[in-house]
């Protein structure tokens, strides 16, 4: 369906919005709703339980592949692997937004309301689309950069 939208920017926004919107919907539903379920999924994902990981993979990997494929169809010049990473970061931002909305209110000193789902969705869509459209990493440049004196595995003091 996304292919019908000719403008790439509009298409990407529609794809990302369709992907994140269910996480914010039905938050007032007493049965749980999208917001509560996504919060639970975020917390369970962070716990690292292998059984939970398998359940989440079986339940959501098909949707994640469809999302990544739709983005890749729109941005064929970006390696799919880069888009996988960017989609991964989207989930982190989505989870963090739903789990700690009060942080937005606090850091904005009250000028933004972290529980404003509509605003959160639009900011998340805009930031994600910008990240998705970023140029692919140049392998020669993307090698890990180390701070002077940094030794891998050594604790920083």
Name every feature range the model reports, one short phrase each.
Residues 19, 23, 38-45, 90, ...:
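Short alpha-helical scaffolding segments that buttress acidic/His motifs in well-ordered protein cores
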Residues 2-3, 49-52, 75:
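Short amphipathic alpha-helical interaction patches enriched in hydrophobic/aromatic residues
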Residues 25, 61-157:
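C-terminal peripheral helix-coil segments that are non-catalytic and often amphipathic
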Residues 2-6, 54, 108-111:
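Short, surface-exposed loop/turn segments at secondary-structure junctions
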Residues 8, 12, 30-34, 52, ...:
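Residue-level recognition of alpha-helical structural elements
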Residues 1-37:
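Hydrophobic alpha-helical connector segments
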Residues 13, 17, 35-39, 84-91, ...:
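Non-catalytic, well-ordered alpha-helical scaffold segments
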Residues 30-61, 101-106:
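Amphipathic alpha-helical segments used for helix-helix packing
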């Amino acid at each position: 369906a996304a292919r019908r939208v000719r403008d790439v920017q509009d298409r990407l926004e529609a794809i990302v919005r369709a992907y994140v919107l269910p996480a914010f919907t039905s938050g007032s539903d007493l049965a749980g709703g999208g917001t509560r379920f996504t919060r639970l999924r975020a917390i369970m994902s962070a716990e690292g339980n292998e059984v939970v990981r398998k359940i989440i993979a079986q339940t959501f990997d098909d949707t994640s592949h469809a999302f990544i494929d739709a983005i890749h169809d729109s941005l064929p010049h970006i390696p799919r692997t880069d888009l996988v990473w960017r989609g991964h970061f989207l989930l982190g931002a989505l989870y963090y937004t739903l789990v700690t909305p009060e942080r937005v209110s606090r850091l904005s000193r009250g000028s933004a309301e972290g529980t404003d789902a509509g605003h959160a969705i639009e900011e998340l869509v805009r930031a994600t689309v910008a990240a998705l459209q970023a140029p692919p990493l140049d392998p020669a440049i993307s090698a890990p950069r180390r701070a002077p004196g940094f030794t891998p595995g050594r604790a920083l003091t």
